[in-house]
Amino acid sequence: MASPLSPSAWLAENPMQSDEQLYVVMGSASEAKPFAAWQTVAGAKPPQPVWAGTPYAGWNEVMPYVGVVEPGSAFLDWVANTRAVDWGWLAVSSCPQEVVLNHLKGLTQVYLPEDQPVFLRFWDGTQFLPMLQHLGDGAARMLPVFQRYLINGQSLAVSPCPLAATKPSPWWRVPVPLLAHLAQQSPQVLIDNLLQWLQEQRPDLYTAFSPAILQYKVAYFVRRPGIGHAELADYLAAQLS
């Protein structure tokens, strides 16, 4: 695996064009507190909350943000030095910030193959980078506003596609092969999605176990073939009988 790239090295390898801007997408849920770091060192126009104007506008503790970063900003030094891998990422786009914001807002929730909506942690590089890598150029159909990414020191380029109109969340459907790939690469992604589904759709099962026991049981469940919501519900119900 190539050595991690710093933001300055990445920008030197991929110089920005005159019509491009450098964006940061970050999540408040990270213990690294990237928003606080921005407030300390950036001192420029504040990033915008992605979920503003949605039913989740008050979820400040887990709010994702998007902002424009100047190439010489001290915030990029913070990015280079942080050890966190879930804080967010950098990307280059020729789109205005409002367009970028609306496309990210459209990914607030996505559909799993069984038509169940779940939140997408698009700001979390540990989840989003494997998705982009597996989708390849197809990632542009999910998020067409970005051409180049730097996520946890890894550079990724996506072939551009025509900029589609923004759509209200949820609209994007997670392909079955991608879900299987994520389960192989990082079972925790699948575990988190299943736990979220239980919390939203089957609170009776979600609250029937302590959090640690439920995590263990779901982690055990995902080892088997034929993973699905109905199968998980049957498995947990059998554990209670």
Segments (PLM) and residue ranges:
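Terminal low-complexity "docking" segments
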Residues: 1-241
